[in-house]
A protein has these predicted regions:
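Short helices/loops that flank or line small-molecule/ion binding pockets
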Residues: 81-95, 108-109, 142-143, 187-208
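Small-molecule pocket liners
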Residues: 126-130, 234-240
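Short beta-strand->loop
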Residues: 112-122, 178-181, 214-232
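A ligand-binding cleft/hinge motif common to bilobed small-molecule-binding domains
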Residues: 96-108, 163, 168-169, 194-197, ...
């Protein structure tokens, strides 16, 4: 009798595993195709400490491998301003682009936006902030005359394009002549630290990084003040090269969009720092294109390297 019960138990467990595998294949019909030999190289723009950022994306790598059998290799880009060259030179398949680098890559390389994350607070957009130290005496564009401005990179929206538009709206058409100096810090986090440490009088960065640092470092709220913010822009999107296998694109998109529907996906999202993913496309970047036109930037020919 004991042996009979053991046999029945084994059969039940085996059946459950088989049904689970069938359900998984039915839920993700693209698994019927073998993706095991596929390797994708995805670039990551520099927003935070490189080790923290890499750890952030490793959980997503594991999930995609478990669900689709695809090996996704992430590579950290040292600067925003070299993504187009590295994309081509290293035969990248895609990237998690911020709004400006996406617009550049879309216009110069033809990449296609796929999905973007939804933050834990339910937002899928960000804003640009312009900020100063509270003790700087600066509260308007007029008071920025002769002051030092820290930008992120020439290839950023919140960290360069938006502040250029802000200055132009306030009658400042030649920032280098008006300001007391400018420099490119390389990342939003570095800009914030530069203003905190009085290496710059004014800074510009995206609100997501600013708010994250404010939650970790009480000095941000205590010592800095935000002067103005931009309209909303899409969060960093996953965009892939145009000629990538359409079935593979579809599989990736469906898997990311459906993550919140299964337990492993929910846990991966929690560790990734997102509630889920939503669809995105080029139409979501209308505000960025307006800013570019406002300051006279042609994205097809823009020289985005820092000088």
């Amino acid at each position: 009798m004991a042996r009979y019960r053991t046999t029945i138990s084994v059969l039940i467990v085996t059946a459950a595993l088989f049904i689970g595998a069938c359900d998984r294949t039915n839920q993700f019909p693209e698994l019927k195709k073998t993706w095991g030999q596929q390797e994708l190289l995805i670039g990551l723009i520099p927003e935070q400490d490189v080790f923290r950022q890499r750890e952030h994306y490793m959980v997503l790598k594991k999930y995609l491998y478990d669900r689709l059998g695809i090996t996704v290799n992430f590579t950290n880009l040292s600067r925003y301003g070299n993504i187009v060259e590295r994309f081509t030179a290293e035969n990248m398949d895609g990237g998690f682009f911020d709004s400006f680098t996406y617009a550049l890559a879309h216009n110069q390389l033809g990449v296609e936006a796929l999905v973007r994350p939804v933050n834990l607070d339910g937002t899928s957009t960000y804003r640009g902030y312009i900020f100063v130290r509270k003790d700087s005496g600066i509260r308007t564009a007029a008071e920025m005359k002769g002051k030092r401005f820290a930008f992120v990179e020439r290839a950023t929206t919140a960290g360069y394009l938006f502040p250029l538009a802000y200055l132009r709206e306030n009658g400042i058409t030649d920032p280098p002549a008006y300001l007391g100096g400018t420099f490119f810090a390389g990342s939003p986090e570095a800009v914030i630290q530069a203003v905190l440490n009085k290496e710059a009088d004014i800074g510009a960065a995206k609100n997501t990084i600013y708010d994250l640092l404010a939650a970790e470092n009480p000095r941000v709220e205590k010592e800095l003040v935000i002067l103005t913010s931009s309209s909303v822009l899409p969060l960093n999107c996953l965009a892939l090269r145009r000629d990538l296998d359409p079935e593979l694109k579809s599989a990736l998109k469906k898997t990311l969009l459906d993550m919140e529907k299964d337990r492993n996906g929910t846990e991966t999202l929690r560790r990734f720092g997102a509630r889920g993913f939503i669809e995105t496309d080029n139409r979501d970047y209308e505000y960025l294109y307006r800013l570019s036109a406002q300051v006279g930037i042609d994205l097809k020919t823009y020289r985005y390297k820092n000088e």
